[in-house]
């Protein structure tokens, strides 16, 4: 019997073709149009289905989420006990840390304030701006994302310290 794979990822045509070479699967970006029977017959799901759609899915053997967090899927009764749950931890650290870094620099240089002034046709000096050179940056979370963010800050001369939830 062929495994039923539901691929909920939002893919390009080229990406779909690459997935299809690996194994036959049904593509339903974000789960649109799937019935209760579709959910309950799936053995593999790639993506982030609504947890309530998985209750009673006794055929499910593997759920891989496109997100790092899986809390909604760990509640009792959401997944069958035999199902493996994997996630995309580590896939987003660099790109998200670049976004955080850009926001940090924008705030340090007061770019939102200057943009607001520009919208009002004002050009007032808002005083000195900060630099990362020699700054002390506290990073909350030392996983993939936090570590990547700390490296970016260090590149511009900041000293970094990190804190995390558990001491491990």
Model-derived features: positions:
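Generic structural signal for small/hydrophobic residues in well-ordered secondary structure
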Residues: 45, 63, 100, 137-141, ...
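Rossmann-like dinucleotide/phosphate-binding beta-alpha-beta segment
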Residues: 128-168
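Loop/helix-junction capping segments adjacent to catalytic residues or to phosphate/diphosphate-binding pockets
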Residues: 13, 94, 147
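Rossmann-fold NAD(P)-dependent oxidoreductase module
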Residues: 18, 99, 103, 148, ...
